[in-house]
Curated annotation (Swiss-Prot):
This is Ribonuclease Y. It is a single-pass membrane protein. SUPFAM superfamilies: Eukaryotic type KH-domain (KH-domain type I) (SSF54791), HD-domain/PDEase-like (SSF109604). Residues 227-287 form the KH domain. It holds the Pfam family RNase_Y_N. It is found in: Cell membrane. Residues 353-446 form the HD domain.
Length: 537
C-alpha cells in the first residue's frame, strides 16, 4: 500500500465524517424544530382547552347559580305554604278548642244550675219527709189509741150482749167480728183515700214537671206501618214485560227478592207485597231500575238484585251511623251500628223503631239530666233498648232477650245491658238509668199518634179489660171506654158498700197490671148508685 492510497483513504474517511456530522446536525436541527413546533402546538391546544374549560366552568357556575336561586325560591314558597297551612290548622284547632270550652262551660253552668235546683228539691223533700214522718208518728199513736178503745168496746159489748141478750159466746163473737170488720173496712178505705190523695198530689206534680220538661224538648213523628209498596209504571204495556215469557221474569224476581209481585187491573201500577221491609225496599229499587233501564230478563234481574242488596247494606250502615251521631252514642261496635240501622225498616204498632229509639234516647237524656244521672249513659241505653227488634224475625227469642245477648256480645256497659233487659219488666231494674229508660220507652210509645194497633188486637184488649173487671164479685156491668184508657165499673148497691168500692178499685188495678200489657195508663172508675122510688096515689 502506498501513501496515495492511504491519503485517499484518510480523505475519504474525513469526508465521510464531515458529511455524517452535517447529516446528523441537520437531523438534530430538524428534530429540534419539530419538537419546538409540537411544543408550540401543545401549548396552543392547552390554552384552547383551558379557555374552553373556563367558559364551560363559567356556564356551569351560572347554571348552578340560577338553579340555586330557583330552588331557593321554590323552597321559600313551600315553606310559606306549609307555614300558612300550619297557621290555618292551629287556628282551626284553637277555634275547635274554644268551641269545646264554651260547650263545656255551658254544660258546667247548666249542671251547676241543675245541682242548685236539685239541692233545693232535696231540701224540700227532707222537709216533706220530716213532716210525713211526724204525721205517720201521730197517726200510729192515734191508731194505737183507737185499737185500745176498740178492745175496750169489744169487751164491754161482749159482756153487754151476753148479759142482755143471753147469747152464747160464739154468737156474740160473730156479731162483734162483723161489726169490727165493717168499722175496719171503713177505716181502711178512709186511710187509703188519704194516702192516695197525698201520693197523687206529690207524684203528679213531680211527674208532670219532669215529663213536661222532657216533652217540650223532643219533637215526635207520626208514622204508619206498611206491608205493601206501589211502583208507578210508564204504561200498562210494561206489565207484560215484567211478567215475561211464560212468567219467567216475575218468577225470577219473586224468588230472588222474596217479595210477591201483584199485577192487577189497576192502571199503571204494580204492587210489591211482603212483611220484610228490607227485602221490600230492595225489590222496589230493583223494579224501578228495571223500568228505567228497559232491559228486563232473568240475568239482568239477578244482577240488579245483588247490586241493590249491596247498596241497601251501605244505606243501613249510614242510617245507623247517623242515628248514633244524632243521639251522641260514640264508640259503638260497627256491627251494632249496622244492626241499629236495620231498625229504620222495622215498625212496631206502626211506629218506626229507629225513630222511636232516637226519641227514647233523647227523653232518657233529659230525664237523666233532671235527676242527676249520667246523661250519655242514659242516652246510650235508651238508643239500644230495642236493638233486638232488628233481628227478632231471624233469631229465636223475644226482642228483649236478643237485645240483651247482643249488648253482652259487644261488651256494652252493665248498666246498658240491665236497661235493655228490664225495660219491659222481665228483669228487675238495678239502676236508676234502667228505670229512666223504661219510663222514656213508655212515654214515647204512649204519646198520641205514635203508635196504632190492628183492629183485632184493639178489640181483644178491650175485651180482656172488661173480663178482668167482671171477674170480681158484686159487679153489675163494666165498660171499657176512651179507646181502652178507662174502665168504668157499675156495682150492685146491695152487695158493695161505699167503703168497699175504693178497695175494689185497687184490686182491679192490681189485676190489670199483673195480667195485661198496655201502652200508657188506664183509669179505673167504680160507680155505686142507690135509687129510692115510690108511687104517689
Amino acid at each position: 500500500m502506498n501513501i496515495i492510497t492511504v491519503v485517499v483513504t484518510l480523505v475519504s474517511a474525513l469526508i465521510g465524517l464531515v458529511l455524517g456530522y452535517f447529516a446528523i446536525s441537520l437531523k438534530m436541527k430538524s428534530a429540534k424544530e419539530t419538537a419546538e413546533l409540537t411544543l408550540l402546538n401543545a401549548e396552543q391546544e392547552a390554552s384552547n382547552v383551558r379557555g374552553r374549560a373556563e367558559e364551560q366552568a363559567e356556564v356551569i357556575l351560572k347554571t348552578a347559580e340560577r338553579d340555586r336561586q330557583t330552588l331557593k325560591k321554590e323552597l321559600l314558597l313551600e315553606a310559606k305554604e306549609e307555614a300558612r297551612k300550619y297557621r290555618e290548622e292551629i287556628a282551626e284547632e284553637f277555634k275547635s278548642e274554644r268551641q269545646e270550652l264554651k260547650q263545656i262551660e255551658s254544660r258546667l253552668t247548666e249542671r251547676a244550675t241543675s245541682l242548685d235546683r236539685k239541692d233545693d228539691n232535696l231540701t224540700n223533700k227532707e222537709k216533706t219527709l220530716e213532716q210525713k214522718e211526724q204525721s205517720l208518728t201521730d197517726k200510729a199513736k192515734h191508731i194505737d189509741e183507737r185499737e185500745q178503745e176498740v178492745v175496750k168496746l169489744e169487751e164491754q159489748k161482749a159482756l153487754e150482749l151476753e148479759r142482755v141478750a143471753a147469747l152464747s159466746q160464739e154468737e156474740a163473737k160473730e156479731i162483734i167480728l162483723t161489726d169490727t170488720r165493717d168499722k175496719l173496712t171503713h177505716e181502711i178505705a178512709t186511710r187509703i183515700k188519704e194516702a192516695e190523695r197525698e201520693v197523687k198530689e206529690r207524684s203528679d206534680k213531680m211527674a208532670k214537671d219532669l215529663l213536661a220538661q222532657a216533652m217540650q224538648r223532643i219533637s215526635g213523628e207520626y208514622v204508619a206501618e206498611q206491608t205493601i209498596t206501589s211502583v208507578h209504571l210508564p204504561d200498562d204495556a210494561m206489565k207484560g214485560r215484567i211478567i215475561g215469557r211464560e212468567g219467567r221474569n216475575i218468577r225470577t224476581f219473586e224468588s230472588l227478592t222474596g217479595i210477591d209481585v201483584i199485577i192487577d187491573d189497576t192502571p199503571e201500577v204494580v204492587v210489591l207485597s211482603g212483611f220484610d221491609p228490607i227485602r221490600r225496599e230492595i225489590a222496589r229499587m230493583t223494579m224501578e231500575t228495571l223500568l228505567q233501564d228497559g232491559r228486563i230478563h232473568p240475568a239482568r234481574i239477578e244482577e240488579l238484585v245483588e247490586k241493590h242488596r249491596v247498596e241497601m247494606d251501605n244505606r243501613i250502615r249510614e242510617y245507623g251511623e247517623a242515628a248514633a251521631y244524632e243521639v251522641g252514642a260514640p264508640n259503638l261496635h260497627p256491627d251494632l251500628i249496622k244492626i241499629m240501622g236495620r231498625l229504620h225498616f222495622r215498625t212496631s204498632y206502626g211506629q218506626n223503631v229507629l225513630r222511636h229509639s232516637i226519641e227514647v234516647a233523647k227523653l232518657a237524656g233529659v230525664l237523666a239530666a233532671e235527676l242527676g244521672e249520667n246523661v250519655n249513659l242514659a242516652r246510650r241505653a235508651g238508643f239500644l233498648h230495642d236493638v233486638g227488634k232488628a233481628i227478632d224475625r231471624e233469631v229465636d227469642g223475644s226482642h228483649v232477650e236478643i237485645g240483651t245477648e247482643l249488648a253482652k256480645k259487644y261488651k256494652e256497659n252493665p248498666i246498658v245491658i240491665n236497661a235493655i233487659a228490664s225495660h219491659h219488666g222481665d228483669v228487675e231494674a238495678t239502676s236508676t238509668i234502667a228505670v229512666i229508660v223504661a219510663a222514656a220507652d213508655a212515654l214515647s210509645a204512649a204519646r198520641p199518634g205514635s203508635r196504632r194497633e190492628s183492629m183485632e188486637a184493639y178489640i181483644k184488649r178491650l175485651q180482656d179489660l172488661e173480663e178482668i173487671a167482671n171477674s170480681f164479685e158484686g159487679i153489675k156491668q163494666s165498660y171499657a171506654i176512651q179507646a181502652g184508657r178507662e174502665i168504668r165499673i157499675i156495682v150492685h148497691p146491695n152487695k158493695v158498700t161505699d167503703d168497699q168500692i175504693t178497695i175494689l178499685a185497687h184490686d182491679v188495678r192490681e189485676k190489670i197490671e199483673n195480667n195485661l200489657d198496655y201502652p200508657g195508663n188506664i183509669k179505673i172508675t167504680v160507680i155505686r148508685e142507690t135509687r129510692a122510688t115510690d108511687v104517689a096515689k
